[in-house]
Regions:
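Glycine-rich phosphate-binding loop of actin/hexokinase-like ATP-binding domains
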Residues: 132-174
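Nucleotide/phosphate-binding catalytic cleft detector across ATP-hydrolyzing
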Residues: 1-136, 153-155, 175-206
Length: 206
């Protein structure tokens, strides 16, 4: 029986920022471990945010040991100061709590909130593309979600409050038609590719 679920999150309230954190290791000749990386990551959830904001996810970018060159994997190196650059994804605390409450009312528990463009990338972007560098743009109804990968790591995310519904509303206003007709025009005659179109082309309103 399924009791826990991953839940996608998006919306105008989503923000992202870069942040550097560090931990000091007092043990002499300490060898960096995976536990150290996990401790450093978990400490980022405790940083002060703006009022009403909550951290949704903390994504490591790279690590620095004792002010040395950045590395993706410092495990096994000796050092006393472990720093890391992180991509923080934040959202409105009330909106997040409402999601948790809705899932609980449905009889489940939220295992993890996942930003929707990151979830989409898991379905359509392969590891080679993430290594080479790729930008995923997911145009939905209410928002356009963006995720940029490079060297296999997510480097930037954003949620833009302009999407398909805005296009439908623009067609509705410009053509003075009802919304269902505008949506049908968009779906039947709209194109995302830059192709030559005839200025004299006549279309019929569904």
């Amino acid at each position: 029986k399924v009791t826990e679920v991953y839940v996608g999150i998006a919306g105008h309230h989503i923000r992202s920022k870069q942040h550097r954190g560090n931990i000091i290791i007092h043990e002499e000749e300490h060898i960096i471990t995976k536990e150290d990386l996990e401790r450093l990551k978990n400490e980022q959830y405790a940083i002060l945010m703006e009022h009403g904001e909550q951290i949704i996810d903390v994504i490591p970018q790279h690590y620095i040991v004792d002010n040395d060159s950045p590395t993706l994997n410092p495990v096994g190196r000796i050092g006393k100061c472990l720093a890391g650059d992180f991509h923080l994804i934040t959202g409105n605390r009330t909106n997040i709590q409402n999601i948790y409450k809705s899932v609980q009312l449905a009889g489940y528990e939220v295992k993890k909130l996942v930003l929707e463009p990151i979830a989409s990338a898991e379905s359509v972007v392969n590891d080679e593309e993430k290594l080479a560098g790729v930008c995923l743009v997911d145009i939905g109804g209410g928002t356009t979600d963006v995720a940029i990968f490079h060297e296999g790591i997510i480097r930037h995310t954003s949620v833009i409050p302009l999407a398909g519904n805005v296009i439908t509303d623009d067609i509705k206003s410009c053509c003075s038609i009802i919304r269902t007709q505008a949506e049908a025009l968009k779906q039947n005659f709209g194109a995302c590719l830059e192709t030559p179109t005839s200025a004299n082309e006549i279309i019929s309103i569904p």
